[in-house]
């Protein structure tokens, strides 16, 4: 499932960054977003146009078209 399908206040692990261009991948890395990292959906706007996630105690805002590239799974750590 993608980050767009995440449920608020649940913790997920990013398992893959799929099919995005190199510039977006570098942007993700600058935010600390990479495979294996834990993230929590804090808030989403109406229709999930934008998402606010927590990664390593940092809050990051993403657009839905960016979040679609982040493949996640539910984390064993809650």
Swiss-Prot record:
Sorted keywords for this record are: Ion transport, Iron, Iron transport, Transport
Q: Which Pfam families match?
A: FeoA (PF04023)
Gene3D superfamilies hit by this protein: 2.30.30.90
Recorded hits in InterPro entries, A to Z, give: Fe-transptr_FeoA-like, FeoA_core_dom, Transcriptional_repressor_C
Report the record's Gene Ontology biological process terms: iron ion transport
Keyword Protein biosynthesis annotated: no
Which SMART domains does the protein's record reference?
A: FeoA
As one GO molecular function, the record gives: transition metal ion binding
Q: Which domain of life is it from?
A: Bacteria
Q: Which family does it belong to?
A: Belongs to the FeoA family.
Primary role: Might be involved in Fe(2+) ion uptake.
Protein name (database record): Putative Fe(2+) transport protein A
Q: What is the lineage of its organism?
A: Bacteria, Pseudomonadati, Campylobacterota, Epsilonproteobacteria, Campylobacterales
